[in-house]
């Protein structure tokens, strides 16, 4: 008889635990959602992500145009020169970047005489070479790729965080609902006991009802936040389907440091600033402030100082050296200061990234240790429930004591599952710091 009662009690308790809160956790109202489904919704409907990709695409197109010839057209339909009407004129200018040191400029002008019968084309072509030009800065294609990856990883981390928060709160709601049922059963049993003072039980029951109401409010807020984040406006209530794995990883700091340094846009920018500052300082020391340029000009129908001796085609080559009369020691000191500041900024960036890496690695290790601890607690809770079953069969404990132990087991199981979720989030934080693609790696720990 006791075995049948105990089995019925256990089944009833599991139903209470799994049923969850009456408003937000019934299967008829909750919509199951997996991480893959949530990520698909986020990347399809997130406006900020779409605008970011659009901006990146436009930046890439503009950078590509910087390497192409630039053509400028100008027209002057009418004008007055020296009190006389001037005919219409027009010009087309061309600028062609030819690399680090060369630049080609050309202009073709077309005008009409007073009778607007004869076309007078004129033009010029200029080729410039700078002997002491600084090297061009490296393309920002890699930087743009890192920024896109950072944007994707941020969305993945936000999605995981929202799902985990909601999952934990739903589990807590089920725990507290089951605890409320337990207190109600305890109060009912107390009322059947003669002269039993149930004042504390009634206080606990009221307090538990208030706790459950607060959890309901928090659940509603989390559901609204998740719906807005996913771009869903139908007011659906979600039930995250999350299963996490604990990976056996060798977290070698030196290898991870290389990944972190290589994937940090801020560190790459700091390195570029230091390289530029050192180049400017080296150039100043080498040239002592002189700038040397060579240029060649080819002119068509350009009027010279003596119109009678003007030729249809004229050309000129020149070498120009310029120097700004400014105290050289001050210039050198300014450049040395800029290089020292850039070097200090780089060292600070590396130190900050290394501190973040060590914190992230320690977070993963601590979370892994917590999973192990919660696993031990779960095993102890399972052993406690088995012991309670044997004690109940021997008539040593009551049904309520068995129910209380079953509640402790459910709490230990949820704590163990939540510790694995925390571990997954800490590992994702570490991978994000290393610049890895979380869109695919996330399913290695969450499925």
Segments predicted by a language model, with ranges:
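Outer-membrane beta-barrel proteins
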Residues: 82-86, 115-117, 303-307, 399
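A glycine-/polar-enriched beta->alpha junction
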Residues: 40, 44-50, 57-72, 84, ...
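Acidic, low-complexity, intrinsically disordered peripheral segments
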Residues: 2-3, 7, 24-26, 254, ...
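Periplasmic alpha-helical coiled-coil/stalk elements that build and connect Gram-negative outer-membrane
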Residues: 2-3, 150-263, 360-363, 367-371, ...
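C-terminal structural cap/anchor segments
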Residues: 328-331, 337-373, 377
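Bacterial Sec-pathway N-terminal export signals of envelope proteins
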Residues: 24-91, 139, 149-152, 156, ...
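Bacterial N-terminal signal peptides
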Residues: 10-20
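Residue-level recognition of alpha-helical coiled-coils
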Residues: 61, 68, 153, 160, ...
